[in-house]
Amino acid sequence: MTKEFHHVTVLLHETIDMLDVKPDGIYVDATLGGAGHSEYLLSKLSEKGHLYAFDQDQNAIDNAQKRLAPYIEKGMVTFIKDNFRHLQARLREAGVQEIDGICYDLGVSSPQLDQRERGFSYKKDAPLDMRMNQDASLTAYEVVNHYDYHDLVRIFFKYGEDKFSKQIARKIEQEREVKPIETTTELAEIIKSAKPAKELKKKGHPAKQIFQSIRIEVNDELGAADESIQQAMDMLALDGRISVITFHSLEDRLTKQLFKEASTVEVPKGLPFIPDDLKPKMELVSRKPILPSAEELEANNRSHSAKLRVARKIHK
């Protein structure tokens, strides 16, 4: 059954306006979600332009088909139900060799967080799931109940940056020996019980970072983003642009590093000119990340941690 998507798009105008949209261009929304970015991008295209929209969540596609109906009727939209790590292969299958621009809105969409049964939220009691793609096999239940102590510590440190990772992993190990940990609230309580009392008084939910780390592991979010962004930069036409919105430091560091590698080059000393194969492919459109306005911060709480980075293709 299709559930309504109630999703406030973050950095809507900045993300699309920075793509410098050509009316007859070929564009990609790598993270369809609530379709806010797609809708605004389509409003800038002529009927000769086309948008390819990726999402691995069928619920997002079903809702977008309603929201974008006027553009679908004109043949301006193609939906691709897949992980964006397969971006290049799926676009090539569709006959696309080059794109004029692409946008990413990384992280979990509000509707996924709000659907209790998806198991993303520590605030709502639900089975441990956290799959963005409901057809995927690995769930949060598997991670929490079957990963060994060392693997749990690794993902809690690496993806959650939680300094109490060892204590939390040990507590999970103890609890699951008694009985399986089955729900989000069970896990949240175990995490709380593993932390010192003074930590529980700090701002923010004590389970937030651990839930984030499990979600990233279940969906291989950073691995997928790394592969996809590199493919996107390869597929950009000259002067094409890429916009990436991130919501936590791990995503932002990854995006910053990928853009840096593509926009800088180490040239051997003494070369009178830079050979074509050494020239950087990209240039940064803005040196620093673009942040939400004061108005947006007030209107949309989700936007507080958002950062937008944009780069442009300057060399094939």
From Swiss-Prot:
Q: Per the record's keyword annotation, is S-adenosyl-L-methionine included, yes or no?
A: yes
Spell out the reaction equation it catalyses.
Answer: cytidine(1402) in 16S rRNA + S-adenosyl-L-methionine = N(4)-methylcytidine(1402) in 16S rRNA + S-adenosyl-L-homocysteine + H(+)
**Molecular-function annotations in GO:** rRNA (cytosine-N4-)-methyltransferase activity
- Record function comment: Specifically methylates the N4 position of cytidine in position 1402 (C1402) of 16S rRNA.
Q: Which gene encodes it?
A: rsmH
Coiled-coil region list: none
Q: Which protein, by its recorded name, is this? A: Ribosomal RNA small subunit methyltransferase H
| Main localization category | cytoplasm
Q: Which domain of life is it from?
A: Bacteria
What UniProt keywords are attached to this protein's entry? Cytoplasm, Methyltransferase, rRNA processing, S-adenosyl-L-methionine, Transferase
Entry's family note: Belongs to the methyltransferase superfamily. RsmH family.
Q: Is rRNA processing found in the keyword set?
A: yes
Q: Where does S-adenosyl-L-methionine bind?
A: A35, G36, H37, D55, F84, D105, Q112
